[in-house]
Design a protein with these regions (language model features):
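N-terminal active-site wall of soluble small-molecule enzyme domains
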Residues: 79-85, 90, 98-111
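His/Asp/Glu-enriched, well-ordered alpha-helical/loop segment
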Residues: 92, 96, 156-171
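Structural recognition of alpha->loop->beta junctions
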Residues: 108-128
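A post-motif C-terminal structural segment
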Residues: 115-117, 135, 139, 164-168
């Protein structure tokens, strides 16, 4: 049968790609269990409940995203110190780390922090590919998103972001 490596929700910064706490009061209030974490101590505290509840992979948002309203696509969100703390805590428990990352700066920071895989890699350069190979970091391209996203039904800002990044993800 299939081998499953379940992850919980993504861990990200306040106001970042993973932050859905502002949509409905009382749902996913900010705290370690929400996955919203700022600073080294909060990042470590956010990893632990996920492991407690059976996550075999910790997913973090190292950069801003395409289908969220915060920041330009690919802008680095976590600091190098925060990423390193998240990776160290997960690895201490034998759990892998996957990083959502579109932009080169955030991808490099995540790779240098020791993440096991980078999801998307839409705006990747040759030097960072070399670094990923040297570090043994898996690249998980999501080039299918160009076919899966209905651009006509996106809000204008998200449509512009998607129209800009999706063709670059295939290069």
């Amino acid at each position: 049968g299939p081998r499953m490596f379940p992850a919980g929700h993504a861990i990200g910064i306040t106001g970042g790609h993973a932050d859905t706490t502002g949509y409905v009061p009382g749902v996913l209030e900010r705290g370690p269990e929400s996955g919203i974490a700022d600073g080294v101590d909060e990042v470590i505290a956010a990893v632990r409940p996920q492991i407690k509840h059976g996550a075999k992979v910790i997913k973090t948002c190292a950069t801003a995203g395409v289908l969220s309203f915060e920041g330009p696509v690919g802008a680095q969100q976590y600091s190098e110190e925060e990423l390193a703390a998240l990776v160290a805590e997960a690895h201490r428990h034998g759990v892998k780390v996957a990083a959502h990352a579109h932009g080169t700066q955030g991808i490099r920071a995540a790779v240098l922090a020791g993440v096991d895989s980078i999801e998307h890699c839409s705006l990747l350069d040759a030097d960072t590919i070399t670094l990923m190979k040297q570090r043994g970091t898996w690249l998980v391209p999501t080039t299918y998103l160009g076919e899966a996203i209905d651009l006509d039904n996106l809000p204008p800002l998200l449509r512009r972001k998607a129209e800009w990044v999706l063709p670059r993800a295939r290069e």
